Each structure stands twice: as structure tokens, then as C-alpha cells.
Amino acid sequence: LVLTSSSASGNYYPVQGSLGGYSSYNSYTGAGYQLRCVREQTTAMPKGRLEGPRAVLIGNSITEVWQGRTDNKTFFSDNDYLPKGISGQTSLQISARFYNDVIVNDPACVVIACGVNDLAENDGQPCSIERVFADIRLMAETGAARGFKVVIGSTPPANRIWWQSEEWNAAHADLGQRVVELNRLLKQYAEERGFVYADYHSALKDDQNGLKLEYSWTPDDRVHPSAAGYAVMEKILKKAVDKALFDPNATDGDGQIDDLDKWEGWE
């Protein structure tokens, strides 16, 4: 897979379409579902933030249940973050609602984090890491074209899927390494495009590339974070969003994000 630093030209936004019979991935890099140009509809839309939230978080169940499981119940309201997660969704399904959940809300920053449900084959089909990466890249380019700052969250660690059978998990014993490889692509892409990469994975993983037991919602889950896991993620997320928006009041947290000291020319 060859990564480039080219950005999407013009205002091309994903629109909801049928998951059946969608176009192949070579019709538009990273598409995987039908796109149409809505240039005529968006020329009248003002650029920049109006009254939107500081950040919209788009993702899967890890995003959806965050507010209910964190011990910091005012984390999202205090930081003006709007979570838009839907349990069980793949990156393809998440990208299909990018317009309604992100663009319509007009945030200053978009945080994109997904991938585990693709690798868990929630749609019943084998999935390559390149396909997941392509969907995430499309969302990132769409957000950047709209004028949003972009944060790409790593896929959190997982080396087994509790809702799949033991036979399935045995046949997918390389899951943890596949998550690592997906995150490598995401990090490299974020570096090339000047986006911020929020590295949840490194902070949450055990020595088997699974979710650390103390950060797992239950001992048998090992996919969804506990309150302690979300506390770690909150530090990483806030620092990432602050850096993406060049907040002069940003302070270091205990989490990790990519290459903070290399940024120059802040205004």
C-alpha cells in the first residue's frame, strides 16, 4: 500500500447509501460506498466554525458508551465534545453517517476512531486492514476539506473478540497484530497529512497486544474499556484535541500522542 500526502480536492462528502451493491474500492480511494459530489449544495455553506462543538467524536461502541462508563461524568460537557458512536458499526457504516453526525454539527475538530468491528467481521465478511484504513482516510479527508481539524484515534488493543466463537478466535489468532498493523498505517498517514494521532493503543495494551485486564470493562470483555481505561483515554483525547486546535493552554497528560515536539510555526 502506497501512502501519499495528497488531499481530496473540492468538497466531496459521503452520503448515506445501501450497504449492498456498493461500488468497489477502486472507484474512489477509500470509498467503499457510493459517493456523490454535493458541491452545488455546499457552496452556500459558510466555512469555519459557527456554533458547533469543540470536537465531534465519531466511532463505534467504544465511543457510544464512554459517557456512561467514565467516572468523570462532566468530561464531555466540560470540554465541549459531542460523542457520536453507534455500537457494532464498521468503518464503512460509520463513514456513511459522517455528513449527518459530523458535518451538520460543524465542529472545530473531528476525532475519528474505529476499526475493531471490521476486524471482528461484524458484517459477516473478511476484512483487510487496508479497507479499514481507506474508510478512515476518506473520513479524515472529508473533514479536512470542510475545514475541520482532524484527530485520528488509534484502534484500541484487542486480541480476541468475545462475541465471536472460540473457533473464530482460534482462526484469527493474529488479531492483536492486525490491530497493530492498522495503527501503523493510521499513524504514518496522520504524520504525512499533519493530522494529530491519538495513541490509545500503546497506553492500554498488554504484552500480548490485548487490552490490559485493569482497563477492560469485564474480565471476559477485553475490547471495551473500563472506567480506568476511559480515564487514560480522556487524557490522551484532550491533549490531542488541544494540539489539533493549537490551544496555548494545552497541558501534558499521562497519555501518548505522536511527536508533540515537532510542531512549529504555531500562531
Predicted features along the sequence, with ranges:
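Cell-envelope and extracellular/periplasmic
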Residues: 84-89, 114-119, 123-124, 155, ...
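Glycine-rich anion/phosphate-binding loops
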Residues: 89-96, 126-136
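C-terminal, surface-exposed recognition/capping segments
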Residues: 1-44
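A generic structural signal for well-ordered alpha-helical segments
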Residues: 74, 143, 189-190
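Serine-esterase "nucleophile elbow" of acetyl-processing enzymes
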Residues: 42-109
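Conserved, well-ordered alpha-helix/loop/beta-strand core segments that scaffold catalytic motifs
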Residues: 110-115, 133-140, 144-153
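Catalytic His-Asp segment of secreted/periplasmic serine-dependent ester chemistry enzymes
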Residues: 157-267
